[in-house]
Amino acid sequence: MFKAQGFNVQYGSDICADRLNSIGDYILITHIEPWQFLKGKVKNQPLEVIEAKDLSKKYLDNLANRVPAVHIVGLGGGSAMDTAKWVHWRRQLPLTQIPSIPSVDACFTRMSALREEGGVKYEGDAVPELVIVDYELFRSAPAPMITSGIGDILSCHTAWFDWKYAHEQGRDEFGWKPSDPEISKTYLKELADCAPGIKAQTDDGLKRLMELHRDVGWRCHE
């Protein structure tokens, strides 16, 4: 069975409220839809709800400088995860990440994907106390936003061809080796095995997809 490495993670159904009710004062960085789904279940409401929308360095630094020194919670997709990571890192505040969809691995990576100069720049070094994976929260999202999570895993395989081509053209900065793609083959096998569960949105299928994301995130920072 595939064994992932990475951040501390808790899996379960309807577990978000328990975490939010137990962490004391916090700022919530989120998108509207997942918070609407969870808000009525949470007794310990956030001091402030901030909608994730701008990933420019200037905006994120200003945001980090103004929030109070309390627990930071990211709830949502990749932009919410990246915003929460930046605030946590800049201020060295405790961080909990709650992805609302399994479409990307942002909750398991340490850098934030900043939008600068018409492109993406990866900066920062965030390590959350805990990542909460709530199956009921996932199942509240549109089905395509759940199944699209296979794309990040598939890209781990297709990217090897770009790296090999760069090596053959004398433009490899990282030292391509023929043995390097073996891990992506492991990912593909696990993905093929759990694909029916992902489509059916079973607990097992969703957990195995997120464990793949977790391992990819860990390997980004080996």
Predicted regions and their residues:
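Active-site segments that bind and position negatively charged phosphate/pyrophosphate groups
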Residues: 176-222
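Residue-level detector of flexible, active-site-proximal loop/helix-junction positions
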Residues: 54-56, 79, 102
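DPxDG-like acidic metal-binding loop motif
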Residues: 75, 82-93
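Alpha-helical scaffold segments in soluble metabolic enzymes
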Residues: 18, 22, 62, 86, ...
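Glycine-rich beta-strand-to-loop/alpha-helix junction loops that act as flexible
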Residues: 31, 75-77, 214
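A glycine/threonine-rich phosphate-anchoring loop and its flanking beta-alpha core
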Residues: 89-187
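ATP/NTP phosphate-donor binding region
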Residues: 1-71
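Short glycine/serine/threonine-rich phosphate/pyrophosphate-binding segments
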Residues: 35-37, 79-86, 104-107
